Amino acid sequence: MGFDLYGEKPIQNEFEHQERWDELSAMSYDERESKGLEDEYYTLMSKYENVNPGAYFRNNVWWWRPLWDFVCENCADILTEKDMNGGHYNDSHIISRRKAEAIATTLEEVIESDETKMWIKEHEDNMEQAKRNNAQVEAELEELKKLVEVETGNPDIYPAIYPDKFKKKYDEIYGKRDWASSYPFNKDNVINFINFARQSGGFSIC
C-alpha cells in the first residue's frame, strides 16, 4: 500500500524523448506488452518524472505518514483540518496550486533549520530504540516457539494454532512491538516532495 500524488497542472519541462514518450503513453498496456515495449516505457517514464517532478510523487505508507506529519506540523497556517486529514487517506483529496506552492516555500525555509534537524534526529533515535525493542520481542517470540514445539511435539506449529495458553502469551509478547521502527523519515524525501509540490500546479492524494 502506498500514496500516489498526481500533479493537477504540472509544469511541463523540456524532455528530449517527449515524442516517443507520448507515443508509448498513448498505447494500452496490452499493446505495449504484445510489442515488447514495456521495458522502454518504464525507462522513459522514470526519465520523464525526473525531468518533470511535478507530475507524480509516490511514497509507500511507511514513508508517507511521517512526511505528511512533518508537512502538517510546519504548514498548519496553510492547510485546513480537512486538508490535513485528507492526506492520511487515498481518497483523491486535492491540495490547490496556491497551497502546494506555499507548502514548498515553507518547507524550503525550514528544511535546514535547527528544529528540523532536531525532528530528524529524534525520529532516527526513536527508530533505533524501536529496532532494539523489536529485536528483544523477536527473541522472546522465538523462545516461546521452541517451548510450544516441545510441549506439542509439532515442529511445524505456528502462532495461529498455538494452544490457548501459548496463544495468549504470544499476543502479550507481540503486543510489545514498537511500530516506530517501520516509519522512516529523512531530508532527501522532504526535498523530493518540495520539488513535486512546487511544480505540481496543485495535487491529488490517491
Where are these regions (language model features)?
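Acidic (Asp/Glu-rich) sequence patches and key acidic residues
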Residues: 1-206
